Amino acid sequence: MKSINIQDQFLNQIRKENTFVTVFLLNGFQLRGQVKGFDNFTVLIESEGKQQLIYKHAISTFAPQKNVQLELE
């Protein structure tokens, strides 16, 4: 049985669909933009033409503007 990585599926889907997302950081700061890439430790967000590399351990929540369809089976 294949292990499902929901985090990677979610991030990859919002990246592929260029979905706008609000990223809530643990310190309360909010970033709005699009996910351009990610790896095991970081997420690259682009907002207003500027890129920010955010460490995943600093992120609390991703809130996409629209629902994300995942294949969980």
From Swiss-Prot:
Any one GO molecular function term: RNA binding
Sequence similarity: Belongs to the Hfq family.
GO biological process: regulation of DNA-templated transcription; regulation of RNA stability; regulation of translation, ncRNA-mediated
Alphabetical UniProt keywords: RNA-binding, Stress response
Alphabetized InterPro entries for the sequence: Hfq (IPR005001), LSM_dom_sf (IPR010920), Sm (IPR047575)
Gene Ontology cellular component annotations, sorted alphabetically: cytosol
Oligomeric and partner information: Homohexamer.
Taxonomic superkingdom: Bacteria
Residue ranges crossing the lipid bilayer per the database entry: none
Stated name of the protein: RNA-binding protein Hfq
Keyword Iron listed: no
Pfam families in UniProt: Hfq
Record-annotated Sm domain positions: 8-68
Summary of the function given for this chain in its UniProt record: RNA chaperone that binds small regulatory RNA (sRNAs) and mRNAs to facilitate mRNA translational regulation in response to envelope stress, environmental stress and changes in metabolite concentrations. Also binds with high specificity to tRNAs.
